[in-house]
């Protein structure tokens, strides 16, 4: 079929428009006095378009991260550990999105360790093992950030592959085995960050007195032991090395990937270990911290496994009370493989290591409820961790006894926007109930 030629008048009109010195919006013509004007409009449109695209790309609330960028990253990195490293690289160098206009609603504020933390959503240990990307992660909206685990000496961890995705379950299995750059390297990273802060304009803000370097947000350092290290001395070395840099110190005795580590959860061993750690912490109080405080007494938390019986959890509560630590994180990864797993690849889901993500939630929540049963009459702070991926999950953990919560695996799957979505969901639900976060802590047991 032959195309129909333009009528004579139409051809003249078309040429007139194409050669017109006017810029058209709809049927209205705006005169362009020169090609310079045309270029200016095009450049302006390009700049505005680029600015909008940049704002969308670097705004943590954008859905593009969960539905496009994170899936692309997973496709580009079949080896999950390479994906982890790529994520840390982006967070470290400012290539990750930030939560713009991050002002938390008052209903999210939580009183913990003498601080009114801006929100109860924390980043769990394991994401940033070597303190490389603290700011990139904190700027996503967390109220609490935990680095590590950090071991005294550098160690490579277990042989690769050691990190596996179960995307159908929003879960991962890891057997990293405390791979760590060691105390000195992590201390150097932390010191450089503090030095840079003290030289900056923000150091003049007297309200920033937390070692996170963010107002009313906390930085925790998770301490581990070397594979062949002494089960007490390694932790004491960590306290001595990092007390001046940490708002909170965490003692990890629950990783399933270091031989014999979970044996430290035995009541007598745990009481002895934690008592010595608290004594070491107390002996260093007068040394102050790197921000110039004359005294500094970071709370000590112990992180436990979910794979414990009620009597074992009760004995941990007893050890925590006897040793006078400040709280318990419930929980680490699980060595169980629940029947609820959607993944059908037996070789994949039977990989040795700790399972985290959505399938961990029922185990962690059950353990938390049990620990709260034996600690609610004390001043111990409980931290909920395991399978949290929504505002409703966070609220469940709070009502079960958690003062605040932590997550990691869901953040890796859904991207930085998850934190804003969780905070929005929690805020909406709390306002619907006419309550604050502080008011719902332990509500299920009242």
From Swiss-Prot:
On the tree of life, the source organism's domain of life is: Eukaryota
Sorted keywords for this record are: Flavoprotein, FMN, Membrane, Mitochondrion, Mitochondrion inner membrane, Oxidoreductase, Pyrimidine biosynthesis, Transit peptide, Transmembrane, Transmembrane helix
Output the Gene Ontology terms for molecular function. Answer: dihydroorotate dehydrogenase (quinone) activity
**SUPFAM superfamilies linked to this entry:** FMN-linked oxidoreductases
Cofactor binding remark: Binds 1 FMN per subunit.
Q: What class of enzyme is it?
A: oxidoreductase
Q: Where is the transit peptide?
A: 1-13
Any idea which positions bind FMN?
Answer: 125-129, 149, 222, 252, 303, 331, 357, 387, 408-409
* InterPro entries for this protein: Aldolase_TIM (IPR013785), DHO_dehydrogenase (IPR050074), Dihydroorotate_DH_2 (IPR005719), Dihydroorotate_DH_cat (IPR005720), Dihydroorotate_DH_CS (IPR001295)
Q: Which cofactor does it need?
A: FMN
The way it spans or sits in the membrane comes to:
Single-pass membrane protein
Q: Which residues bind substrate?
A: 129, 174-178, 252-257, 332-333
Q: Where in the cell is it found?
A: Mitochondrion inner membrane
Where along the chain is the active site annotated? 255 (nucleophile)
What single Pfam family name could you report for this chain, choosing any that match? DHO_dh
Enzyme Commission identifier(s): 1.3.5.2
What protein name does the entry list? Dihydroorotate dehydrogenase (quinone), mitochondrial
Which gene name does the record give?
URA9
């Amino acid at each position: 079929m032959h195309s129909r030629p333009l009528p004579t008048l139409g051809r003249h009109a078309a040429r007139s428009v194409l050669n017109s010195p006017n810029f058209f919006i709809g049927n209205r013509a705006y005169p362009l006095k020169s090609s310079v004007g045309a270029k200016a409009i095009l450049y302006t449109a390009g700049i505005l378009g680029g600015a909008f695209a940049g704002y969308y790309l670097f705004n943590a609330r954008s859905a593009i991260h969960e539905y496009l960028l994170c899936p692309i990253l997973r496709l580009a990195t079949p080896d999950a550990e390479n994906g982890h490293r790529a994520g840390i690289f982006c967070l470290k160098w400012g290539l990750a999105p930030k939560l713009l206009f991050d002002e938390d609603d008052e209903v999210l504020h939580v009183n913990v360790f003498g601080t009114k933390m801006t929100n109860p959503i924390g980043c769990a240990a394991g994401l940033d093992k070597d303190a490389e990307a603290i700011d990139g992660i904190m700027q996503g909206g967390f109220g609490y950030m935990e680095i590590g685990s950090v071991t005294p000496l550098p160690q490579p961890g277990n042989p690769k592959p050691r990190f596996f995705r179960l995307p159908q379950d929003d879960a991962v299995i890891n057997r990293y085995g405390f791979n760590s750059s060691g105390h000195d390297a992590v201390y150097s990273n932390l010191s450089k960050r503090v030095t840079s802060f003290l030289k900056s304009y923000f150091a003049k803000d007297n309200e920033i007195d937390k070692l996170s370097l963010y107002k009313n947000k906390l930085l925790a350092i998770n301490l581990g032991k070397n594979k062949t290290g002494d089960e007490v001395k390694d932790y004491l070395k960590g306290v001595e090395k990092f007390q001046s840099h940490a708002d909170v110190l965490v003692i990890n005795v629950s990783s399933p990937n270091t031989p014999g580590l979970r044996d430290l959860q035995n009541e007598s061993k745990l009481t002895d270990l934690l008592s010595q750690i608290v004594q070491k912490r107390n002996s260093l109080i007068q040394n102050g911290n790197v921000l110039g405080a004359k005294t500094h007494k970071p709370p000590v938390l112990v992180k436990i496994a979910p794979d414990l019986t009620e009597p074992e959890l009760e004995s941990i509560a007893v050890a925590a009370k006897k040793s006078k630590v400040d709280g318990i994180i419930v929980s680490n990864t699980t060595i169980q493989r629940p029947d609820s797993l959607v993944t059908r690849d037996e070789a994949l889901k039977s990989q040795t290591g700790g399972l985290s993500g959505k399938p961990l939630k029922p185990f962690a929540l059950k353990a938390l409820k049990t620990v709260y049963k034996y600690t609610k009459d004390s001043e111990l702070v409980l931290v909920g961790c395991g399978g949290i991926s929504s505002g409703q999950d966070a609220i469940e953990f709070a009502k079960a006894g958690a003062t605040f919560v932590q997550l990691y695996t869901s953040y890796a799957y859904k991207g930085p926007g998850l934190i804003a979505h969780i905070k929005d969901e929690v805020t909406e639900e709390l306002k619907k109930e006419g309550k604050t976060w502080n008011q719902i802590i332990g509500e299920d047991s009242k």
